[in-house]
Amino acid sequence: ISDQKKMTDIQNLSLDDLLPRARVAEDVIKNASNKTLFISGAGGSIGSEIARQLLKHSPIQIILFDVSEINLFNIERQCQAIKEAQNLSTEIIPILGDIRDKKNLGYLFKKFQINHVYHAAAYKHVPLVEAPHNITKACENNIIGTHNIALIAAEHNVESFVMISTDKAVRPSNIMGASKRMAEMFIQSLNSTASKTKFSMVRFGNVINSSGSVIPVFLDQIARGGPVTVTDKDV
């Protein structure tokens, strides 16, 4: 019998296998149960996980908002599968749209009685955003887009608005970080003036297994037979 091994013989690792700590206990039920939730960037790495986790707590409606048709299609299918598996009554509403379109946002917030907003829509890939021909669009999306959805949320007296930010907003050294920091500053200013909406932010570091992060890149490179590449010789 040959002792040669194939790639298909290697057991797949879950993310839990790679993490040295236990999962953090969730405390989101009061913000999700029997509420209408709006998730911008719902098809992205972070937005889709927010959607999957919040859905388990039985909101009345969960509005999945994304500019990407294929990402929206995928997260809607995943949420429908969770709904069926757990026998939930939540209405799942996938909506194609752009946070830069303030008029459309106003229409949606008027149509749906939204209680909580989770704003995860952003351009986040540093090298792409840093390219001279992408800077303007990145700033429009990350700054103006955040400005639009936050103002609309305040105008419609949404209970809470959570902006998903990044650790790169701390003393930013690139366009992505600077654009997110400017968005943060606007959210902070709204929190001191908006009477009914509670605005807050959470800064993420590098999110394991997110799109464009090292794990999916490495897995793809290994599956193709290598080589596995890094961004700097000193890494």
Regions found by a protein language model. Give the residues of each.
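A conserved pocket-lining segment of Rossmann-fold NAD(P)-dependent short-chain dehydrogenase/reductase
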Residues: 217-235
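Active-site-adjacent segment of SDR/Rossmann-fold oxidoreductases
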Residues: 189-197, 222-223
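Hydrophobic/aromatic anchor residues within beta-strands of the central parallel beta-sheet
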Residues: 94, 138, 161, 199-202
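SDR active-site strand-loop-helix element
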Residues: 39-40, 65, 117-121, 161-166, ...
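Glycine-rich "substrate-gating" loop/helix at the edge of Rossmann-like oxidoreductase active sites
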Residues: 205-210, 232-235
